[in-house]
Amino acid sequence: EALVEQGNEVVVIDTLLRGNKIPKHIFKEVEFHQVDVTDEESVAKISKGADMIFHFAAILGVDIVADNPIETMEIEVNGMQSVAHAATVNQIDKIVYASTSGVYGHLALEKSVDEDILVDPCTSYAMAKRYNEIYLASLHDEKGIQSSAIRFFNVYGPRQDNRMVIPRFFEQAMINDPITVYGSGDQTRDFTNVKDAVKATILLSEKVHGMEIFNVANERESTIGELADVIKSMTNSTSEIHHIDAPKKRYDYEVG
């Protein structure tokens, strides 16, 4: 959406398995292909003539990833291979890749982290994201293709899937259903507004050099319990906040 508004010619590849969330006025301005990112031949054909590839295709959602670990990794790894092939055969020398804060794993629970720390991914999603970061580094060394890998921290905003925590809480609060919180609610997240994430992404796309990794976050932690209270207050909801049990690994960390 932001790229179109800047006057760029944009080509979109998506399976639409979760529906079409592109606004109608923007959809009319893009060239759209309903294609799976793992379809190497199609991705290469469609991306011919492009100056840059933004690779943001992935399976998202903690529960979905937990239930489909192999499929999650296959789509991540094969999707990246497809994008790398397209960049190579079409002589596209820049890739912007959506990685995740999840690569830090338990390390992020214990201390502040930066891009240079030795990471400790704990989910199939985060492991695959880290693999792809390493792959991009080798792609630069071997093929000269430059890239930026962006480790997003819990992005939220309009049109987000309601299986994610913020839209789920809003949905529950607006109909006065119980707001369900896993565990104590003391687990923390660094929530990043999608507008800030977009600004950072576009800025980094203009400064792609070598292979670099960046964190995109707001530097302020909030607990899930605080989030539930804020959303309840914002919506003037009569919802009760229900704390429910979940496996420890489920709520200590989440994909970003």
Predicted regions and their residues:
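N-terminal Rossmann-like NAD(P)+-binding domain of SDR-like oxidoreductases, especially those catalyzing
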Residues: 1-155
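A short, amphipathic alpha-helix embedded in the catalytic core of nucleotide-handling enzymes
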Residues: 3, 139, 168-172, 200-204
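Generic recognition of short, well-ordered alpha-helical segments
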Residues: 45, 67, 78, 108, ...
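A glycine/serine/threonine-rich, flexible loop-to-helix segment
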Residues: 111, 162-170, 252
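The catalytic Tyr-centered alpha-helix of NAD(P)H-dependent dehydrogenases
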Residues: 121-128, 152, 158, 162-166, ...
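Hydrophobic alpha-helix immediately C-terminal to the catalytic Tyr-X-X-X-Lys motif of short-chain
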Residues: 131, 135-139, 169, 227, ...
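C-terminal substrate-binding subdomain of Rossmann-fold SDR/epimerase-dehydratase oxidoreductases
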Residues: 173-256
